[in-house]
Amino acid sequence: MSRYSSSWTPLPALPDPEGFAGMYAGTCGEIMICAGGTNFPEKPMLEGGAKTWTDRIFTLSPGENEWKEAGTLPVPYAYGASAGIREGLLCIGGCGKEGHRKDVYLLN
């Protein structure tokens, strides 16, 4: 899982059958982090399904074959910006069920 590799390797699926849109994603050292996001677990949006927001955080370490659940965000939200920095993963802004947010969190 070198960040400087010129080849792609498929990663294991996140442990949720629906997956998530709008997640915060990046790396902290060699560990990948995915947090937050939205999905439609009951039925698809085009069939009138209700969007849900998640606060779940997942990590994937080098050589591992499955994601680990690693805590939760302070609130369920998604669709912000994320940046991997030396200290961890910055999660910047986004929105939740109640509307737009301007919080900034550091996950490490």
Which stretches of residues belong to each language-model region?
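Kelch-like beta-propeller repeat domains
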Residues: M1-N108
